[in-house]
């Protein structure tokens, strides 16, 4: 402690006396040394802390470690020794035993004291080493025992000074380095042990980093090439070592070799890898990177042997590496943000190894994956960064070897990694991820030859998934892995078929960048059809996987390639939903939904039909499970950090809606759902971020909900894919129909209302809509009742009735209270389920969105609608009576209008632009209610006119999206306008709608019409909503929905005629603002 006392007290005199006294005072009465249990432990720690703080303060100003380091002090000059202090000389004079004990003791003390001092920097660490050294004079049983337990009692805890290492690591320099130097000054290779504190504190319990370095190499090289092992885990697999590694180069080298020689050999490679700009971040990122690499290496079992043939840990890693894979994936998301670009590039290199990897397995698969996968990967690599490439390349080689050794053994792990990688890769590199996904999906199917490639791909994905967005989906990785493991055996025979299809698919995927997608879907469909003929179960599953991957690749370029892939995706989705939606659907429901959302992005109603026809619904049980897994992977992959999630949520909910339709009747809903997904995808693109937030919960609940919906929907698949004529616009209705089917399982008018609500729900909420419809509907209904009461009061209150912003604001509070429900969709689903509720709910969801997207008057209408809807749900008849305020006719009209105005505007704004496409008639029905509301809320002219259509499918979503997607509504206008035209639902004055709604059928068409008339009548709708407050609307809405549901077949004709009439009226009343007339 001389140095400590000197620094603290500034005493320059003889410290021997004081030092001896301290030694005795601090000595442990049991061991005679200063241990943690010694009476002077606290004093020592305190003094040391004070000294350390002072030292840090000084170092902070000096900032130069060189003055503190003396390479001559240590045998390994590469390891800078801390500033030489008198105490070191004193220690050198003492016995080696005492010195070691004292050093260890001091190290233990330093560890204890440094633990809170984790924030100190390497410079600080150096002083720590010094500090630790003085204590050595006093033997420390505690620290010695600790070091012995660590297994490096004699090793010097020294940290090479590296500016890149910003994380606080406390170097505890014992006298052993000096003594070691004295004992073996010429020793070429010397072990340096270092106790890490701070970031390494995760392992700071007793973790000691052992640096294997040759005495000759320069400190820089040592730091670069040193392999760090905690808890004497140097012998453990690299994956374990990866955690300790903090130098990008050293980190990688650690993976490569466990010995200094290996490290030296690996040093160049790590050096090649540019460490992140931030030392601490870089260490973490590098740590994570090596981990994936190590995973790959461990998984393959070749990497470790290749780099370090003597390392046996790789053999131990099978189970351990699986764990590490999970951990690594979890960690990687966090640390991969910087590495993300490099992972992108790595896919290309991985694709190359992929080719090689199958070599061990199947030549065909190698050619297929090598050719197709490689081409596919290059796309990913285009956006990928080059940094991870070298490691990835080496990893693929190792993987190849491991695959050759036992590809099936690692396949599940590879798949798991692949899944996680895909998730990550998908999020970060859209283009790169999709091709990988395409390759990945197939990989899941083929167990043998694909396994090596999968492993490589997994590694690639692991590298590619640098984006931290995927961590949420990481949980699915184990599920996907387990799923893949099961199906792999099943898909063995379908492997060839899948490879054939996969080749086409991959080729398409490789070609798929943007425009190519349109052509590949047809090709893929053909293989799919062929495969069902050959082996529907496996080939179809395989084709689904390929198609899904294709879809994911299509999702990459959502703008250009979205249309064609969706058709294939819907088919696959239908097949999956038909075949095995229960288990894999539950697991990959979210992912699959995401994937479906991507697929739904593209209008493809006919293709799904063909697929349905081609492949038996029940054939794909096993292969579907595998495909489901693949789809899950792909679905996870398609999820973009921002919009990807949103589309996924919308698509997911839709896929759930459509997938549950396992019957032939369900095929149509599937097609519609697919189209709707398409539309949703389109919608999602404009405003995915806000939607992406809610997605996670919907994904979770949606699975259960979707199952329930499927149960409901199976008997109810009325919505026909025949809606193709309405294909562009009907898609939102189709989705709404699917939801409606789910909701109207009992055959309630909510079929109509539900579609409106469905469209009304925000993108993310759509996910929840099906869930809530099926599972959360009960509590949601309770919420709806509460909201209804509130809305009733608000409606009754003059403010709520007052048209214009005041009413909209009144509605807003309700919406605000209801918004949480919308996000959770507790209240919305109940409303959706309940015929009156859906309409009210749509309006309730709608008001917020309207507030954002529609002028205040329109908002007022929406608010009124929402209030009336919420209120009417519990009191449909009561509200109908209140509706008498405006008159029964006005009520009927407004009821139709309110659903369309409130929900439709939002639906149209949030959903229609998302889900234009086949199924328009069904959706038109939904739009009828939604558009009425939309009408009321669509005070914003043509723009909102377009919106009314979209809100139908996503009104809830819009309710939520209003918060952040008010502009999305504007974006949706074009799609909405198209939807309005296609769905024979032109913007009609609310007045006209109300008039047309005198009859329920007429009201239904008008419900659809409000969407078209929404923009024109939005101001008017606002006034009407304020006047009517939707009590009558609610009453009529349920009835209108009932009529829609009951006369859904006739609804189209009624809607057509009504739309024509209303269209004429709308054209007449559009300029007069029917709101006034309706009022």
UniProtKB/Swiss-Prot annotation:
Ranges of biased composition (kind: Basic and acidic residues): 398-412, 669-678
Disordered, as annotated region: 97-145, 261-281, 297-317, 331-362, 376-412, 506-566, 637-678, 840-975
Biased composition (Pro residues): 336-345
Composition bias, Acidic residues: 98-113
Domain of life: Eukaryota
InterPro entries per the UniProt record, alphabetical: Spata31g1-like (IPR026677)
Biased amino acid composition, Low complexity: 551-562, 645-655
Compositional bias segments (type: Basic residues): 942-951
Entry function: Dispensable for normal development and fertility.
Protein name: Spermatogenesis-associated protein 31G1
Native organism: Homo sapiens
Source species taxonomy: Eukaryota, Metazoa, Chordata, Craniata, Vertebrata
Gene coding for it: SPATA31G1
């Amino acid at each position: 402690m001389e140095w400590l006392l000197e620094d603290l007290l500034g005493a320059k005199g003889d410290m021997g006396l004081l030092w001896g006294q301290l030694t005795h005072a601090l000595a442990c009465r049991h061991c005679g040394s200063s241990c943690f249990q010694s009476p002077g432990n606290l004093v020592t720690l305190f003094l040391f802390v004070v000294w350390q703080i002072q030292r840090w303060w000084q170092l902070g100003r000096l900032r130069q470690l060189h003055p503190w380091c003396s390479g001559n002090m240590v045998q390994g000059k590469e390891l800078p020794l801390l500033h030489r202090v008198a105490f070191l000389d004193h220690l050198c004079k003492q016995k080696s035993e005492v010195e070691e004990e004292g050093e260890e003791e001091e190290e233990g003390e330093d560890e204890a004291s440094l633990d809170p001092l984790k924030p100190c920097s390497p410079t600080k660490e150096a002083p720590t080493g010094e500090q630790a050294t003085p204590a050595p004079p006093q033997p420390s049983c505690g620290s010695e025992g600790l070091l012995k337990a660590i297994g490096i009692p004699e090793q010097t805890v020294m940290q090479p000074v590296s500016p890149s290492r910003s994380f606080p690591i406390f170097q505890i320099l014992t006298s052993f380095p000096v003594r070691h130097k004295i004992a073996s000054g010429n020793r070429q290779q010397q072990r340096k042990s270092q106790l890490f504190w701070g970031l390494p504190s995760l392992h700071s319990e007793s973790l000691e980093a052992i640096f294997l370095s040759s005495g000759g190499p320069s400190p820089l090289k040592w730091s670069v090439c040193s392999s760090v092992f905690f808890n004497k885990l140097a012998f453990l697999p690299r994956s374990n070592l990866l955690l300790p590694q903090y130098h990008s180069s050293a980190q990688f080298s650690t993976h490569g070799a466990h010995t200094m020689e290996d490290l030296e050999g690996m040093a160049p490679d790590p050096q090649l890898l540019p460490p992140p700009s931030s030392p601490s971040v870089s260490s973490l990122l590098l740590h994570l990177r090596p981990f994936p690499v190590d995973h790959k290496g461990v998984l393959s079992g070749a990497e470790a042997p290749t780099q370090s043939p003597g390392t046996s840990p790789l053999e131990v890693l099978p189970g351990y590496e699986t764990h590490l894979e999970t951990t690594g994936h979890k960690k990687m998301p966090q640390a991969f943000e910087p590495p993300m670009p490099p992972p992108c590039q790595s896919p290309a290199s991985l694709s190359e190894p992929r080719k090689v990897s199958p070599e061990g397995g199947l030549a065909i698969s190698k050619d297929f994956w090598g050719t197709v996968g490689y081409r596919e990967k290059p796309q990913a690599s285009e956006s990928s960064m080059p940094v991870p490439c070298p490691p990835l390349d080496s990893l693929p080689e190792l993987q190849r070897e491991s695959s050759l050794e036992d590809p099936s053994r690692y396949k599940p792990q590879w798949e798991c990694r692949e899944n996680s990688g895909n998730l990550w890769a998908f999020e970060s590199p859209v283009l790169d991820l999709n091709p990988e996904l395409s390759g990945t999906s197939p990989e899941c199917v083929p167990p043998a030859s694909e396994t090596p490639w999968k492993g490589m791909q997994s590694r690639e994905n692991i590298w590619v998934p640098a984006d931290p967005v995927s961590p949420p989906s990481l949980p699915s990785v184990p599920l996907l892995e387990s799923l893949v493991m099961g199906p792999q055996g099943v898909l063995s025979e379908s492997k060839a078929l899948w490879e054939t299809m996969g080749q086409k698919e991959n080729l398409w995927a490789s070609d798929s960048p943007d425009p190519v997608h349109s052509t590949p879907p047809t090709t893929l469909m053909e293989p799919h059809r062929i495969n069902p003929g050959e082996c529907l179960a496996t080939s179809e599953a395989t084709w689904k996987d390929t198609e899904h991957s294709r879809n994911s690749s299509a999702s990459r370029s959502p703008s250009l390639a979205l249309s064609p892939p969706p058709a294939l995706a819907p088919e696959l989705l239908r097949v999956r939903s038909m075949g095995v939606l229960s288990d894999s659907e539950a697991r990959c429901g979210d992912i699959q939904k995401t994937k479906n959302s991507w697929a739904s992005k593209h209008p493809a109603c006919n293709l799904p039909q063909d697929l349905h026809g081609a492949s038996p619904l029940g054939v794909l049980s096993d292969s579907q499970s595998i495909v489901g897994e693949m789809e899950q992977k792909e679905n996870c992959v398609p999820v973009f950090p921002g919009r990807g999630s949103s589309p996924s949520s919308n698509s997911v909910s839709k896929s759930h809606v459509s997938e549950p339709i396992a019957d032939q009747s369900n095929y149509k809903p599937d097609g519609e759902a697919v189209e709707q997904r398409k539309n949703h995808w389109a919608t999602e693109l404009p405003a995915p971020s806000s939607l992406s937030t809610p997605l996670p919960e919907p994904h979770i609940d949606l699975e259960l909900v979707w199952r329930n919906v499927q149960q409901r929907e199976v008997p109810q698949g009325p919505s026909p894919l025949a809606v193709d004529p309405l294909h562009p616009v009907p898609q939102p209705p189709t989705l709404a129909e699917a939801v409606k089917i789910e909701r109207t399982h009992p055959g309630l008018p909510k079929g109509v209302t539900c579609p409106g609500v469905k469209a009304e729900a925000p993108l993310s909420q759509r996910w929840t809509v099906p869930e809530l419809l099926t599972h959360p509907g009960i509590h949601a209904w309770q919420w709806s009742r509460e909201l209804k009461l509130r809305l009733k009061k608000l409606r009754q209150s003059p403010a709520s009735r007052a048209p214009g912003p005041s009413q909209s604001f009144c509605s807003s509070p309700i919406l605000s209270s209801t918004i949480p429900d919308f996000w959770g969709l507790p209240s919305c689903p109940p409303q959706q389920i309940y015929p009156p509720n859906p309409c009210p709910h749509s309006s309730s969801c709608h008001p917020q969105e309207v507030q954002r997207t529609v002028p205040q008057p329109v908002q007022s209408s929406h608010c009124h609608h929402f209030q009336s809807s919420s209120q009417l749900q519990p009191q449909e008849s009561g509200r109908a009576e209140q509706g008498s305020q405006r008159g029964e006719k006005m009520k009927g009209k407004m009821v139709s209008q309110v659903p369309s105005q409130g929900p439709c505007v939002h639906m149209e704004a949030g959903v229609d632009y998302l889900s234009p496409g086949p199924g328009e008639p069904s959706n038109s029905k939904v739009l009828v209610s939604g558009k009425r509301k939309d009408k009321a809320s669509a005070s914003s002219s043509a723009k909102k006119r377009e919106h009314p259509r979209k809100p139908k499918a996503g009104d809830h979503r819009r309710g939520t999206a209003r918060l952040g997607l008010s502009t999305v509504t504007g974006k949706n206008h074009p799609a909405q306008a198209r939807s309005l035209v296609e769905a024979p639902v032109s913007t009609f004055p609310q007045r006209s709608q109300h008039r047309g709604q005198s009859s329920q059928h007429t009201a239904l068409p008008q419900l659809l019409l409000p969407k078209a008339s929404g923009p024109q009548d939005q101001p008017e709708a606002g006034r009407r909503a304020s006047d009517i407050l939707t009590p009558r609307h609610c009453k009529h809405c349920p009835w209108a929905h009932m009529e829609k549901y009951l006369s859904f077949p006739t609804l189209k004709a009624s809607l057509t005629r009504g739309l024509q009439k209303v269209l004429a009226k709308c054209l007449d009343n559009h300029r007069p603002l029917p709101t006034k007339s309706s009022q």
